[in-house]
């Protein structure tokens, strides 16, 4: 995320936790305040700050379907202590009702990757862990195949024929 300012800012004392992404420029819209772990890097002219979100923040934003899903659902509000000008003056806060729309938007084009899975044959449950949130509504259990070792010549496998999927609140785990 790149934030542009009307004058040079002092990025050494920037507070990422004063930044909130919003789905609309109205009070009561879906929003997400950056929790921390984000890194801010000051760049030259024009006066900009580059914000690299912590993975936990990026995943949390992706997990809110109506937030930052397109340019039409991506707005930003800032607290006055987000950053100061080089003269020490605080920036003008941008309230939730006056949130600024994104000027350039790049959609997430990276598909989630399965990291690990566990299976419990006593409870008939399988837990799959992904590297980013998944949309349980688009998850198709019938597209899941469990196979034996790749080195096995017979290539034994079983394709699932049903079951219901439940996703964890952070979107990173799916239980069948």
Predicted features and spans:
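Non-catalytic beta-sheet/beta-sandwich ligand-binding modules that flank or precede catalytic cores
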Residues: 1-176
